[in-house]
Amino acid sequence: MSDVPELIHGPLEDRHRELGASFAEFGGWLMPVSYAGTVSEHNATRTAVGLFDVSHLGKALVRGPGAAQFVNSALTNDLGRIGPGKAQYTLCCTESGGVIDDLIAYYVSDDEIFLVPNAANTAAVVGALQAAAPGGLSITNLHRSYAVLAVQGPCSTDVLTALGLPTEMDYMGYADASYSGVPVRVCRTGYTGEHGYELLPPWESAGVVFDALLAAVSAAGGEPAGLGARDTLRTEMGYPLHGHELSLDISPLQARCGWAVGWRKDAFFGRAALLAEKAAGPRRLLRGLRMVGRGVLRPGLAVLVGDETVGVTTSGTFSPTLQVGIGLALIDSDAGIEDGQQINVDVRGRAVECQVVCPPFVAVKTR
C-alpha cells in the first residue's frame, strides 16, 4: 500500500479533460493548471474574461446563537464592520501570531457565518474554531458540498448578466440567486485583481452552471483558465498565497496584512503576540521585486546586498502583462532597503539584479 494520500477529484474533472486541460496537485486536489496555455489565459482574464474552477477551496459553516460574535472573537478582522450580504478577508492565527490560514468570511446572519478557507487548511481552520467554540455552536466542514467557479475580468459582468445572475453587489458583497433551478451564491470577490465574481453552486449541480458560464465566457471573447494563470495574476497583484507569503512562521504583519487585523478588538486568536510584534515592528516585510534583466524568479532564493543575505523570495513568475520577471520576497527590516533600490537575487549561483518595488505590479481593478 502507498503512504501517499489519494488526490481529491473535483466535480468538473471530466469537463476539464474534454477541454484539453493539463492537471497538477494543489492542496491535496487534482486541479486543472492550464488549457490553451497560462499566458493566453492570463491575458484573456486581464483583457476580457477568464473562467476558473477553484472548487478545491474550502467551505465551512459556523451556525448557532451568536455565531458572528464567536467568529469575530476568533478571526483577526473586525466582523462587526460588515453585516448580512457582505464578505470580509480575514486570518486565522495561532496564539504565537503565525497564520493557520487566510480566508473569506461571509456574513449570512448574526447566527450564521460561511467560511471559504484554502484547500489544504480547511480542516485546521475548522479544528481551531471547534476547539474554541462555546456550546450551542456548530462548525461544519462542507468542503465537498459546494463547487467554486470564478469569473474574472472586465467582461465578467456581461457573462453573469447573460445568465440572469445578479451583478449589482459592491466589492466584497454577495447575493443568493439561482440558475436553471440550481441555487448559486454569487460573490463580488476574486484573486486576480480584476473586476470579477465567485459563484458557489452545490457540488452535484456544478456542471449545469459551469456549462452556461463557459458558453457566455466564450461569447465574450474569454476562455477557461487554470491555476497557472491564477497564480501569475495574483503574483502581479502582490496577493499572498498561504505557504509562500503567509504561514505558521510568517505573521500577518510581515506579509503586510495588518489591514486585515481588528487591532481595537478585545479578542482574536494570536492577539497578544501580534500586538507585541506591532509595537516592536516586524523583523521582516514582504516586498516586490522586478527583474532588471531577463530571467524568472522562484521561491526560496536568497536576496543579497553585496555578499550579505537580507531576505528570501517567496514567489516568482514571468509577468505576461509587464513582460518581465517579478517576485515577492521577505526582506529584513533592519537592512534598510528602500523602494526603488537595486538588490541582487542568487539564481543558481548567479547574482541577478532586481529592483525593489511596492506591489501591486499592475493596477487594481477589483471595484
From Swiss-Prot:
<dbReference type="GO" id="GO:0008483">
    <property type="term" value="F:transaminase activity"/>
</dbReference>
<comment type="subunit">
    <text>The glycine cleavage system is composed of four proteins: P, T, L and H.</text>
</comment>
<dbReference type="InterPro" id="IPR028896">
    <property type="entry name" value="GcvT/YgfZ/DmdA"/>
</dbReference>
<dbReference type="InterPro" id="IPR006222">
    <property type="entry name" value="GCV_T_N"/>
</dbReference>
<dbReference type="InterPro" id="IPR029043">
    <property type="entry name" value="GcvT/YgfZ_C"/>
</dbReference>
<dbReference type="InterPro" id="IPR027266">
    <property type="entry name" value="TrmE/GcvT_dom1"/>
</dbReference>
<dbReference type="Pfam" id="PF01571">
    <property type="entry name" value="GCV_T"/>
</dbReference>
<keyword id="KW-0032">Aminotransferase</keyword>
<keyword id="KW-0808">Transferase</keyword>
<dbReference type="GO" id="GO:0004047">
    <property type="term" value="F:aminomethyltransferase activity"/>
</dbReference>
<protein>
    <recommendedName>
        <fullName>Aminomethyltransferase</fullName>
        <ecNumber>2.1.2.10</ecNumber>
    </recommendedName>
</protein>
<dbReference type="GO" id="GO:0019464">
    <property type="term" value="P:glycine decarboxylation via glycine cleavage system"/>
</dbReference>
<dbReference type="GO" id="GO:0005829">
    <property type="term" value="C:cytosol"/>
</dbReference>
<dbReference type="GO" id="GO:0009274">
    <property type="term" value="C:peptidoglycan-based cell wall"/>
</dbReference>
<comment type="function">
    <text>The glycine cleavage system catalyzes the degradation of glycine.</text>
</comment>
<comment type="similarity">
    <text>Belongs to the GcvT family.</text>
</comment>
<dbReference type="InterPro" id="IPR013977">
    <property type="entry name" value="GCST_C"/>
</dbReference>
<dbReference type="InterPro" id="IPR006223">
    <property type="entry name" value="GCS_T"/>
</dbReference>
<dbReference type="Pfam" id="PF08669">
    <property type="entry name" value="GCV_T_C"/>
</dbReference>
<dbReference type="GO" id="GO:0005960">
    <property type="term" value="C:glycine cleavage complex"/>
</dbReference>
<dbReference type="InterPro" id="IPR022903">
    <property type="entry name" value="GCS_T_bac"/>
</dbReference>
